[in-house]
């Protein structure tokens, strides 16, 4: 299979898996505590990830690398995914997906604010707008439905989750750690 076809296949699989996690998480929080469900999901995913690299013959991280990974896991998986999953108790999966789709925009804006040298190019703005419009088109019917008195709490939690994921992504991209991840 050509590299370009592999890339398209990977993008398609990632889009389907990522897109369905919002609906699956929404269903899950109806039947179990949100942080328990998020923990199970992250544990299974992490175990498969580590297993894949061990099968390939990769070494386990050093103590320093492990501590860094632990810190990033707390920021991104506990804070972001845990809070996002908890927020799904109060809002629709479509609205949660729309808020999460603001992630690329928040990364660009945070990087621009803190790292002034970063230029926001027209291509970047067009890509961000098209991505957000695409998610909006898919979830527009579901996204603005208000359910229950804790709706605002769900929106706030989803925004906090999106911002913590953005900050974690920026930290990872700017930290030089020699690890195969």
Segments the model singles out, each with a brief description of its role:
Residues 16-17, 21-22, 51-100, 136-137:
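Specific transmembrane alpha-helical segments of multi-pass solute transporters/efflux pumps
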Residues 16-47, 92, 167-181:
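Juxtamembrane helix-loop-helix junctions in multi-pass membrane proteins
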Residues 10-11, 15, 69-73, 85, ...:
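Residue-level signature of transmembrane alpha-helical cores of multipass secondary-active transporters
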Residues 31-79, 104-110, 164-168:
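Transmembrane alpha-helices of multi-pass small-molecule transport proteins
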Residues 3-7, 31-35, 39, 61-67, ...:
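Juxtamembrane helix-entry segments on the extracytoplasmic side of multipass membrane proteins
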Residues 36-47, 76, 84-123, 161:
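Specific alpha-helical transmembrane segments that line the substrate/conduction pathway
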